[in-house]
Amino acid sequence: MIENQSDNIDIKENDVLNQDNAPEDNSSAAEKTIENDELSPQKTEEINTEELKNTISNNDARLEQLEKEHETLKNQYVRISADFDNFRKRQSRDQDDLKVQLVSKTLTAILPIVDNFERARQQLKPESEEAQALHRSYQGLYKQLVEVLKQQGVSPMRVVGQQFDPNLHEAVLREPSEEFKEDLIVEELQRGYHLEGKVLRHALVKVSMGHGQQNSQEEVEKDTVEEDIDSEENTSEDV
């Protein structure tokens, strides 16, 4: 009985001691929690700042990469656009050249007919009324041909008295002339034509050798004659 009471007293003392110690433990835990609460915002801020720096750095790198890609695509677009524009111009130019070639071929085939009409007009001198009527008839056809040529952009060359130009003219004959200086065209043997500023057919012409060339030629002939005479005289003396 006495022992039981003693045990109860011991238990109560232990409870009292535990109660005395409990506030101290709770206070220590609370202090640790407060310290953790005070350090947490600073650490969080440091972590957030580092993450933000990394994010900004990654975004800058991505932006730089996108700018490079944009510049590359822009250059490709400009180059493709320029190539397409050049292709379009080249196609248009080729079509124009082909058109000119086809028109030139057709008109060149017509020009000999025009030449025949012009020669006939110069040579024929109709006297009777019937001949004059026929002359007027084919001259009307000639005028129609000339008008068609004009509508197609064909224009005749005017060459007499002009400086000889191998790009425009073809020299068939050369002869001395007192009227025309050297390399001037004396006569048109076959008319030349332009088509839209380009040569459709070269003019066949006679070109002057100049007055000096005539004198030189006469002197050469005179020297040749004198040499022949001297040769004959020497032959006679030998005989």
From Swiss-Prot:
A GO MF label: adenyl-nucleotide exchange factor activity
Pfam family, one: GrpE
Region (Disordered), start-end ranges: 1-50, 209-239
Source species: Prochlorococcus marinus (strain MIT 9312)
Record keywords, A-Z: Chaperone, Cytoplasm, Stress response
Keyword Cytoplasm among UniProt keywords: yes
PROSITE patterns: GRPE
Subunit structure and binding partners: Homodimer.
The keyword Hydrolase is assigned to this record: no
Biased composition (Acidic residues): 218-239
Locations listed in the record: Cytoplasm
Function description: Participates actively in the response to hyperosmotic and heat shock by preventing the aggregation of stress-denatured proteins, in association with DnaK and GrpE. It is the nucleotide exchange factor for DnaK and may function as a thermosensor. Unfolded proteins bind initially to DnaJ; upon interaction with the DnaJ-bound protein, DnaK hydrolyzes its bound ATP, resulting in the formation of a stable complex. GrpE releases ADP from DnaK; ATP binding to DnaK triggers the release of the substrate protein, thus completing the reaction cycle.
Biological process terms in GO annotation: protein folding
Protein family (similarity comment): Belongs to the GrpE family.
Skewed-composition ranges (Polar residues): 16-30
InterPro entries tied to this protein: GrpE, GrpE_coiled_coil, GrpE_head
NCBIfam families: PRK14140.1 (NF010738), PRK14143.1 (NF010741)
Protein's UniProt name: Protein GrpE
One GO cellular component term: cytoplasm
